[in-house]
Curated annotation (Swiss-Prot):
It comes from the Bacteria. InterPro entries: Ribosomal_uL22, Ribosomal_uL22_bac/chlpt-type, Ribosomal_uL22_bac/org-type, Ribosomal_uL22_sf. One of its GO terms (molecular function) is rRNA binding. Part of the 50S ribosomal subunit. Belongs to the universal ribosomal protein uL22 family. One of its GO terms (cellular component) is cytosolic large ribosomal subunit. This is Large ribosomal subunit protein uL22. One of its GO terms (biological process) is translation. The gene is rplV. Gene3D superfamilies: Ribosomal protein L22/L17 (3.90.470.10).
Length: 136
């Protein structure tokens, strides 16, 4: 490995140590429906976000709640202590399209209508709240 490549790899590795995230792949929910739930908690303090997700009536909220609990556990594992209230926030959450299953539905006059069963990938990052962010 070259010197410049090694330096950039070490920098990436150091940056990875301070990132706390969880990924959820191939969720059988349409990305549009999942983004509604993701927009509800983006930038929120994690325990407040858990409360919002718990009382949301959307099906995707239960999946995102489980993902958020996993991200909090990842943070606790790396820092070797429990997260306190007001310490962590959802720094970013992204919902990307995954594979789409294509099915046919019988239609009049021998035709077939296409049914697209969409799925998505969700990536959630948590980060510590800094002093200036706590004013919000």
């Amino acid at each position: 490995m070259g010197a410049r490549k090694r330096i950039s790899a070490e920098a990436r590795k150091e940056a990875q140590k301070t990132m706390y995230f969880a990924k959820l792949n191939n969720v059988p929910t349409s990305p549009r429906k999942m983004r509604l739930v993701a927009d509800m908690i983006r930038g929120m303090e994690v325990f407040r976000a858990l409360g919002v997700l718990k009382f949301s009536n959307k099906e995707a909220a239960a999946r995102v709640e489980k993902l958020l609990r996993s991200a909090i556990a990842n943070w606790e594992q790396k820092n070797e202590r429990k997260a306190e209230a007001g310490e962590l926030c959802v720094s970013s959450i992204s919902v990307d399209c995954a594979t789409t299953l294509k099915r046919m539905r019988p239609a009049p006059q021998g035709r077939g209508y296409r049914i697209r069963k969409r799925s998505n990938h969700v990536t959630l990052f948590v980060d510590t709240l800094s002093k200036n962010d706590s004013q919000n």
